[in-house]
UniProtKB/Swiss-Prot annotation:
Domain of life: Viruses
Protein name per Swiss-Prot or TrEMBL: Uncharacterized protein US31
Residue ranges, compositional bias (Low complexity): 128-148
Family: Belongs to the herpesviridae US1 family.
Highest classification ranks of the organism: Viruses, Duplodnaviria, Heunggongvirae, Peploviricota, Herviviricetes
Residue segments, region Disordered: 126-161
Length: 161
């Protein structure tokens, strides 16, 4: 596979994976966003969309580094194809290719996003006083059925009807 084919394949995956979590239709606008610390992978965002955007950027960078060793993934994403924007300053001679893992990075991102959303929803529906029901003598009754996630409408994947 030629370098141009690798870049085209990378761009297709970036475009497709962006459409999995965002409806803006312009993945390059997410690449233009610069953090105070470039390549920061674990921010503490308040909103889940920010979390997904940062994780998506990290996966785009990682997938870029699998086919190119130039360490300029943002430049590749924001500029045109190799033949148009990289006429003389191309790093094609230093590019390499590392085989893809069994599951593509965007599938792992989608899976981790779903797990994160499930944990977040479960935390919202779990009552804070689980196990704190007491009898008149002040001892715990041991009845924690009110803490079941089933009573709050949160199910695991296999239990949902």
């Amino acid at each position: 596979m030629s370098l141009l084919e690798r870049e085209e394949s990378w761009r297709r995956v970036v475009d497709y994976s962006h459409n999995l979590w965002c409806t803006c239709g312009n993945w390059q606008s997410h690449v233009e966003i610069q953090d105070e610390e470039p390549n920061c992978e674990q921010p503490e965002p308040a909103h889940w969309l920010e979390y997904v955007a940062v994780q998506w950027q990290a996966r785009v960078r990682d997938s870029h580094d699998r086919w190119c060793l130039c360490n300029a993934w943002r430049d590749h994403a924001l500029r045109g194809r190799w033949g148009t924007a990289y006429s003389s300053g191309s790093s094609a001679s230093s590019s390499g290719f590392v085989a893809e893992s069994k599951f593509t990075w965007w599938k792992r991102l989608r899976h981790s996003t779903r797990r994160w959303l499930f944990r977040r929803r479960r935390a919202r529906y779990t009552p804070s006083n689980c196990g704190e029901s007491s009898t008149s003598s002040g001892q715990s009754s041991g009845d924690e059925s009110n803490c079941s996630l089933r009573t709050h409408g949160v199910y695991t994947r296999g239990e949902q009807h």
